[in-house]
Amino acid sequence: MPSLFDSETDAPEERKVLKRTLSAQKITFILTALCAVIYFLQNVGFEELIVDLFHYPAYSWEDQEIWRYFTHAIIHLSVPHILFNLSWFWLFGGAIERRFGSFHFLLLVLVSAAVSGAVQNYFTGPAFFGLSGVVYAVLGYVLVVDKLHPHSFDLPEGFFTMLLVGLLFGFISPLFGINIGNAAHISGFILGLVWGFLQSKINIKKFS
């Protein structure tokens, strides 16, 4: 029967495991925490200030404010919005970072935020927010890498079907009064597929 002393003995080991996990996915942890803090601040009276500072460039004088091409991704507008994005980002983004390293993952995050934002802006203008363009890039990346190198990631059964349903829902969501950034989702997903394919072909040693 486990005793109190067993629990005390296990605690340091659990802390070591947690420390190793966070160390192996630093970017995932930092961005997840940043999105959560930003969302909290939005809900305690700072939403207007945050949106003004971080939205995608809307005016010519904002084009030189380089951070705006990325920071639109850390703003979320509802609880379901942030929970969906951060859940998938933590699960699959963390898997990519642990496998391929923080620098590679950070590059994927930054490029997908910039590309999905530019595409969404082209179709709808600058009024969009959220990490979903990055999340779909992460999901596309994981999908193609696991197809080319089976069991690279521990994907749940029906993963591909889930992605298709998510993308299709985006197209019919306006019928239910829900506006979703389809252009960001699709462009992020395509970017992730291409990136994962190239990664699989160029850096074979990572999969051996």
What are these regions (language model features)?
Residues 2-208:
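A detector for small-residue-rich transmembrane helices and their helix-helix packing motifs
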